[in-house]
Amino acid sequence: MVHGDLLYHDGLFFSAKKEDGTYDFHENFEYVTPWLKQADLAIGDFEGTINKDHYLAGYLLFNAPVEVMDAIKEAGYHVLDLAHNHILDSQIEGVISTADIIEKAGITPIGVYTHEPRDQAPLVIKEVNGIKAALLAYSYGFNGIEQYISKEDYNRYLSDLNEDKMKAEIERAEKEADITIIMLQMGVEYQLEPTEEQKALYHKMIDWGADIIFGGHPHVVEPSETVEKDGDKKLIIY
């Protein structure tokens, strides 16, 4: 089971704040938790950061209270995608702290590399009912904040749309897993149709070995399609 953004605007902070100054976000998931609990693998896109040493922010930058992860864990998520344009909203420290808080909740982050550099990191592979699923995630950009970090940190921690890197990673996933799932942050916000660039890249990914591509970023429902490759059907959701 896969869905789009967990995007915490400051209005959600206010509604979740308790009299003692702490937060409780469990109510946010009241109606979806029964569905998430049924999933063999539940993947969400956490669009923002959690950095306790940075001020809270709910637009244009996003940095949520640490308590959001308690609610996300209890809702039933197994994997959270961090490859998105807001992952640098509380700087590199926010990338590291967000991934660390997710891991401490027993959830697997994808789309950032906080242990080994991207070019040395092992693939994230989840075995579900005997099927090995490789999970990869990529973002079109980082809202220009990347210009304020070093090239070394950019290449080490982040997962961008460098085609040579993506091709190598997807081809490797095809060898190591039974199915390759891509979470992709790309497109134009609030546009109901994919761009030509989206279509071209998503089809390249199918050629490289991707089986399912879940697109994100537009914040509206764009079309989906099935693609025939080597006698199998591949799924693209733009």
Predicted segments — roles?
Residues 1-238:
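Acidic, metal/ion-coordinating pockets
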